[in-house]
Amino acid sequence: MRQPVVPQPPKIGVDIPWVVSWSEEAPAGAGPCPTVDGQVAALQAWKPGAGKPLPARNHLRRQRDSVRAMLCPMCGEPTPDNDRWSRTGRFVAAGVLRARGLGQALPEDLDDDRVVLDCGSIAPLHFRCTPAFERALPPSLLADPDLKGFPPSWVVVPLYVQARQPITGKTVAAVSFLQLVGITNDRDPDWRSRLPQG
């Protein structure tokens, strides 16, 4: 007689990316956070593995930690300079990002035709973690089949939300996620043709 197979819960860093939220990790208001040098940031309970994984929703603190410390979003370990890969980033000219409203976050001396790797809110991962990360990602994030090496230079762009102070009711800007933009040495002489229309 065959023994019943008891399903194992998903393992963080193996089946489920380290950076994702879990259903028991409720929002926790806004307050100072070391991930943004003490600035006000959106906060969230820290209970990885509690409840059900929410693969399409990054945990606020773990996301900021992953970008600031270059931690692999799959396993949560540091990525060395020679082992940083982006599965979801897109190459675009700096001028296109400026046209989308990210101009103040990019270095002033970065030419508009310089190609950057816009990684959004997903930090680079280890090459060895790529297959597991791809299996765990929602299909909508896998539109581009290419794995891209992450450039040696980058900038971090804080993304803000409006948070309400519980006592005064006043709204304050709070960092939600950190966007990561890698800076390449490539140029796109036709970058203006890729500007948003309208």
Question: Where are the model-predicted features located?
Answer:
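Short Cys/His-rich "knuckle" micro-motifs
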Residues: 79-87, 133-139
